[in-house]
């Protein structure tokens, strides 16, 4: 004989028609968050206990250079006598705007070359070379700016090439220096350095331009890139 209660399926195991209560998991949320924070702290300690720390500093310096250069470069170019506004067909043309656009366009090629370069040479070597180029270009800019239009346009194109070409190189460096189990976290910290702390570059550039000249600004940027190159040298020895 079949049990009637089992046959009609109307009663739950507690002897009533009510469904079994589902446990309240609201208390699990704080526990889960706390566990996640502990895991993140542990992973961060493991990450910064490696050569990634040195790479992190190098990326931070690159971020300062990147933002310090590109934030105010349009204004610096607009004030350059070699790129003074001209009248064309009754319209005022700003050559500085076209030069800056060309700089950004050349940066596309720089990113491609930078990425390809890491397939041919060690990423640290490429990183060092690009930092050195950025330093030389920044220190040379005030002098080249006074020479004439063609040299000024040329150095702007070189700046665009190298400043954007550095991006894929540092990404490869980060991937090589971070342990496999914290690769994702390493990119989070890297972009914090690049676009978070590195954003101080815009503030530094603004302060320098307010209290000094554009020549001083490019000297500061040259020093920043030089420090980046020294950091990569330390990374190669790590």
Per-region residue spans from a language model:
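Intracellular helix-loop hinge segments at the cytoplasmic ends of transmembrane helices
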Residues: 71, 75, 168-177
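C-terminal transmembrane helical hairpin of 12-TM major facilitator-type secondary transporters
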Residues: 120-173
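A late C-terminal transmembrane helix in Major Facilitator Superfamily
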Residues: 175-214, 221
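Multi-pass alpha-helical transporter architecture, strongest
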Residues: 217-238
């Amino acid at each position: 004989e079949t049990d009637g209660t089992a046959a009609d399926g109307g009663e739950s195991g507690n002897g009533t028609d009510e469904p079994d209560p589902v446990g309240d998991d609201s208390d699990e949320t704080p526990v889960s968050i706390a566990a996640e924070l502990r895991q993140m702290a542990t992973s961060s300690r493991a990450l910064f206990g490696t050569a990634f720390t040195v790479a992190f500093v190098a990326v931070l310096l690159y971020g300062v250079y990147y933002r310090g250069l590109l934030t105010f470069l349009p204004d610096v170019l607009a004030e350059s006598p070699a790129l003074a506004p001209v009248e064309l067909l009754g319209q005022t043309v700003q050559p500085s705007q076209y030069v800056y656009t060309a700089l950004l366009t050349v940066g596309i090629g720089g990113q491609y070359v930078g990425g390809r370069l890491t397939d041919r040479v060690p990423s640290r070597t490429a990183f060092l070379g690009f930092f050195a180029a950025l330093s030389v270009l920044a220190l040379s800019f005030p002098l080249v700016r006074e020479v004439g239009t063609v040299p000024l346009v040329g150095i702007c194109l070189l700046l665009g090439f190298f400043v954007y070409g550095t991006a894929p190189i540092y990404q490869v460096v980060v991937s090589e220096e971070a342990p496999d189990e914290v690769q994702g976290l390493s990119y989070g910290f890297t972009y914090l350095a690049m676009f978070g702390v590195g954003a101080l570059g815009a503030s530094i550039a603004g302060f320098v331009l307010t209290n000094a000249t554009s020549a001083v600004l490019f000297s500061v940027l040259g020093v920043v890139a030089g420090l980046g190159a020294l950091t990569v040298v330390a990374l190669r020895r790590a």
